[in-house]
């Protein structure tokens, strides 16, 4: 293989490992993981969409894929030799990527009704929505909505 072909391969993998996958993972984190964490934390105001579960497991899958691409980039740049340990590490990262991708596609939609049930029993939609709608803001039961903001602090300050 010519040197310029190896250089092109290395630069494309380096671009994916350093720029593309971290940017993609950041978007998955802020759209999938962070809102689900607010549900786990029992926040007073949450944003819920059942597809966030798919994004959460997709975040884990693409994190392992990013590690896999970084390992391959290091191997391509000849910084480490290809040994049994390195081969094992690359095999494990691609297997974990596929496992979490399978969970995101198959199991996450099956878990979604249970999370939706939890949201419906402990929260109510803030707005004119009746029922569960994708991308709705919910607040804890017993609290009032005021233009999408929680007005409990204002009510306690008036009394």
Swiss-Prot record:
Keywords: Membrane, Transmembrane, Transmembrane helix. The chain crosses the membrane at residues 10-30, 52-72, 96-116. This is Uncharacterized protein YkfM. It is a multi-pass membrane protein. It is found in: Membrane. GO terms for cellular component: membrane. GO terms for biological process: DNA damage response; response to antibiotic.
